[in-house]
Regions:
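A short acidic, helix-capping loop that chelates divalent metal ions and anchors anionic groups
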Residues: 170-175
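Cofactor-binding loop segments of dinucleotide-utilizing enzymes, especially the Rossmann-like FAD-
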Residues: 8, 41, 135-138, 166
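N-terminal beta1-alpha1-beta2 submodule of the flavodoxin-like/Rossmannoid cofactor-binding fold
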Residues: 1-108, 182-227
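Short, glycine-/small-residue-rich phosphate/pyrophosphate-handling segment
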Residues: 95, 108-160
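Hydrophobic anchor at the start of a short beta-strand
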Residues: 3, 35-36, 131, 160-162
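Beta-strand-loop-alpha "switch" segments that mediate conformational coupling across diverse proteins
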Residues: 161-169
Length: 227
């Protein structure tokens, strides 16, 4: 399987969320070796979409001549896109949002109705492509935190998507937190293996992964410097 990892964190490899992403990929590779290419979007030259729609009218050619041309070509050659990013103001960091905006050349001006919504018709066949979102945040729980990012991801990629959201994720880069983070990374690694084998993750396993690692009030006290 060809996997394109899109890291939206400005921290690159030291991202808390990338700790989870690496564990997931390690699990996938246990089920069979994959070709993995990790891209730190902060290091790529990606201009902002101007909304001119030129790309939708001329076969996908964007007015900007930057790194997106090569990234779009790689998307078409991939089997799985992993969107790895921390929660910024309840949504995606700017590098990730700029990247997604610039995938517009993969769509055409034509629209079709799917259920109750209208969507643009693709300019290529994406039926084989799967999408995985891995997102961490520094809050003690998930309630009223991830909803915006999750909703946007589902709208952008309505088919073949899987979503992992984990609170208290800054602990993944704290050595003293290893007694609680290592078991969680082991679960994420297990999820990667299951995903590679079956294309899905059991709801029970997802629930374990997405739950707080330590009691919410304890985490809040540590974050506030009260413990």
């Amino acid at each position: 399987m060809k996997i394109m990892v899109l890291n939206g964190s400005p921290k690159r490899e030291t991202s808390d969320t990338m700790c989870m992403t690496r564990a997931f990929i390690k699990g996938m590779n246990e089920a069979g070796e994959n070709a993995v290419h990790t891209i730190h979007l902060i290091d790529r030259h990606i201009e902002y979409c101007t909304g001119c729609f030129s790309c939708m009218k001329n076969g996908g050619e964007c007015i900007h001549k930057d790194d997106m041309k090569g990234l779009l070509e790689e998307i078409l050659e991939s089997d799985l896109l992993i969107f790895s990013f921390p929660l910024y103001c309840y949504g995606m960091p700017a590098p990730m949002k700029a990247f997604i905006d610039r995938t517009l050349p993969l769509s055409s001006m034509a629209m079709r109705k799917v259920g109750e919504r209208y969507e643009h018709v693709e300019q290529a066949d994406f039926s084989h492509l799967k999408y995985l979102m891995i997102c961490g945040c520094g809050f003690p729980n998930s309630q009223h935190n991830f909803e915006l990012a999750v909703a946007q991801f589902k709208l952008c990629f309505p088919n073949h998507h899987t979503i992992i959201t984990v609170p208290e994720s800054p602990m993944f880069n704290v050595l003293e937190a290893a007694p609680v983070t290592k078991p969680r990374l082991a679960l994420i690694r297990q999820a990667g293996r299951r995903y590679a084998e079956s294309g899905k993750i059991e709801p029970e396993l997802l629930e374990q992964i997405c739950s707080p690692m330590i009691p919410e009030d304890v985490y809040a006290k540590i974050a506030n410097g009260e413990a």
